[in-house]
Amino acid sequence: MVQHKTNRGFRFCIFPGYNWCGPGCSGPGAPINRVDAACRDHDLCYQMHHNRCECDQAFLHRLRPLINPYTQEGRHARLLYNYMKLQTLFTCRF
């Protein structure tokens, strides 16, 4: 995990170099790949919608086709997918 100093304190980006994946890791900057773009869209969905479960479901659908054990991006997609799938079992029950 990478720590970046911000005006509000530290933020935690799950993967080095990513701009949008992780608690408090919401930009700035363009996404560096499709996984980072999915994280950005998930963050924006949370900001614009009250139904977080719909945002989480959309995030899972976006990550699933990106999973690939032979690429770093695909492995990151798998890690985020598995984490979110587990979290939604408790928070959204799907």
PLM regions: where:
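Extended terminal accessory/targeting regions
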Residues: 1-94
